Amino acid sequence: MDKENFTRLRGELFCDHPLARYTSWRVGGKAERFYRPADLFDLQDFLTQLPSDEPLTWLGLGSNVLIRDGGIKGTVILTLNRLKELSVVNSQLVFREKSGTEDFFSGNGKTIIRAEAGVTCAKLAKFCVSQGLEDGAFFAGIPGTVGGALAMNAGAFGGETWRTVIGVETMNHQGEILKRTPDEFKIHYRQVEGLENQFFIAGYFCFNHGDPDKAKTAINALLKKRNLSQPIGKYSCGSVFRNPPGDYAARLIESAGLKGKSIGNAEVSEKHANFILNKGNASAADIEALIHYVAQHVSQNHGIQLVKEVHIIGRS
């Protein structure tokens, strides 16, 4: 299936396309098909022309995913900088067909932002600062896109994505867009249930209006804290494991003596033990083996089974 099988496409379609460059670990095999839509409407056109049973994988910044060396079957859709609309919206127009929602959003001092899935969380944070929305600053610490943040309830510095969400737009395999509210999902720590073969394409976020200078100060303080504690600039996925209740994965890994542990060219960071680094030419197999090694040794040392935050996908 190549571009000749489609009509009206404005995006870019590739076959047997290498994926490593699209992940923050810089590892992974090829996609059978890889599509970069021109925009949301082009994505709809593309999906309506795919077979109904075509496997779909959605990729944003590639920062919370490990793609195995054997690559991915079916079609990979890249949202980063493609689904990129970001704007303040009229609160009275948000989900007005959903009974009762207008009343909830009619309070003074609230600002509603619509961000599409391919917008980076860093860009969303900067946009919040420009609008004087201090409680959106935590998004600066999430190394991903809005779509990924919605899918896993990403968080940083005490903030969580879904605490700010008042609505989402999802898309199914047929390219149909649905508007949904948070009560249609089960939201957990780093997990969201209820998507059911749909994909997040936009979120509506509600923030309190505040002082732009305070918002800028808040984001700068959070970024300084992140730079001091995390291996910024290295090939990693961010946090590999979720924090267990009442503890921190990094503390457990460090106390098990695993800082600096390597398998192949994958290494547990000396700076932050919940980060695994690609030292330059690691394979996905190296990284996956080290993930399992760390989880096994933490279990042996502490009796705690760490749960992966990173998603491992593709063929070995």
From Swiss-Prot:
Pathway given in the UniProt record: Cell wall biogenesis; peptidoglycan biosynthesis
GO molecular function, one term: UDP-N-acetylmuramate dehydrogenase activity
Keyword Cell wall biogenesis/degradation set for record: yes
Boundaries of every FAD-binding PCMH-type domain copy: 27-225
Cofactor list: FAD
Reaction(s) the record says it catalyses: UDP-N-acetyl-alpha-D-muramate + NADP(+) = UDP-N-acetyl-3-O-(1-carboxyvinyl)-alpha-D-glucosamine + NADPH + H(+)
Xref: Pfam families: FAD_binding_4, MurB_C
Keywords: Cell cycle, Cell division, Cell shape, Cell wall biogenesis/degradation, Cytoplasm, FAD, Flavoprotein, NADP, Oxidoreductase, Peptidoglycan synthesis
UniProt EC number: 1.3.1.98
Family: Belongs to the MurB family.
Entry protein name: UDP-N-acetylenolpyruvoylglucosamine reductase
Protein species of origin: Coxiella burnetii (strain Dugway 5J108-111)
